[in-house]
Amino acid sequence: MTIGNFRPATVLIDETAILHNIQHEVARLKKQTQLFAVVKADAYGHGMLRVARVAKAAGATGFCVAILDEALGLRKADYSEPVLVLGIVPSQYAAIAAAQTISLPVSSTEWLEQALPVLEAQPELPPLRIHLALDTGMGRIGFTEDQALKTAVAFVEAHPKQFVIEGVFTHFATADAPDDTYFKQQVDKFNHLVNLLPSRPRYVHVSNSATSLWHAACNGNMIRYGVAIYGLNPSGDAIPTTPFPLEPALSLKSELTYCKQVHAGDGISYGVTYRAKGDEFIGTVPIGYADGWLRRLQGFHVLVDGQYCEIVGRICMDQFMIRLPKAYPAGTKVVLVGQSGDQEITLLDVAKYSKTIHYEIACNLTPRLKRQSVNPVD
């Protein structure tokens, strides 16, 4: 997708906020516990390489991504730190990961059996580093049964030139919820399955941001620190208090491209779902649903000159309209996410109106919106 460099619409990334959010968590960790920065999905829309650079400066010792392509992107950018792919990678690509010392998750002996000939075909490669995924209640990937796990471990031990168990992990489904009943059940199952291993691997990890923030006693010797890097509370506002203040890193700003006066009954946008109630000033903002500004945000608001201005009419692919308190010239600043005067719109505000989570809003902001760092970290 083409980046809109010649359009007044910018995602601003505060690098100092990212540094703060990581450094404060690193300071809370036990000495033996490492922090891997989760930079999947282009670092939740913040820019993978930008965040990786700041995370490394802040004390992160490794990275987690979702797909092999993201891991290769880090290697191409000369990041030599450990990189763990969190999603299942097709077995035919096992040799690519091994060649780049990229760690992969394993959820079945079948995957190991399929990857074996791929790795045997290139005997010069180092053993593939694998992390055994344990499904303790997330229901996504991982071993659930004792015997299945034992069989996989035995297979790995029988092929030491092709595989090495570097880690074991699980993922909690409710770490961000006030009720920890299910969370504790998952902890118990994880401990049971880990105790089946002949020895503990280098990395034993269970903690995402929510787990590390609110259940730090469960941290193994590595945490997968994700959404909190970006200053977003993993729970939304279900658990409003965090051990230290999280600083939001992302803001979204634009400008008016056009302003006009309309009169009572005049229609705005597709379907004419909004008609002016009287003489009104309508401004046009050059962002639309093709940029990830969701169509269902009609009726929400943005900030102009420190004032809330309602989004009127349907949001178009590339533009939307707002009702202004007075006439403003083209070029007037518009804040979609962030501060203007004494007012602020957060990603969580946008998410609540959209009936979703702030993770999704951040990830939905498309590459067409140019990204720009503020408060850069050397």
Swiss-Prot record:
Pathway: Amino-acid biosynthesis; D-alanine biosynthesis; D-alanine from L-alanine: step 1/1
Superkingdom, taxonomy of origin: Bacteria
Residues with the N6-(pyridoxal phosphate)lysine modification: K40
Gene Ontology biological-process entries: D-alanine biosynthetic process; peptidoglycan biosynthetic process
Single GO molecular function: pyridoxal phosphate binding
UniProt-listed InterPro entries: Ala_racemase, Ala_racemase/Decarboxylase_C, Ala_racemase_C, Ala_racemase_N, Ala_racemase_pyridoxalP-BS, PLP-binding_barrel
Active site: K40 (proton acceptor), Y270 (proton acceptor)
GO cellular component, one term: cytosol
Cofactor: pyridoxal 5'-phosphate
SMART domains in the record: Ala_racemase_C (SM01005)
Keywords: Isomerase, Pyridoxal phosphate
The protein's name: Alanine racemase
Organism: Lacticaseibacillus paracasei (strain ATCC 334 / BCRC 17002 / CCUG 31169 / CIP 107868 / KCTC 3260 / NRRL B-441)
Gene this protein is translated from: alr
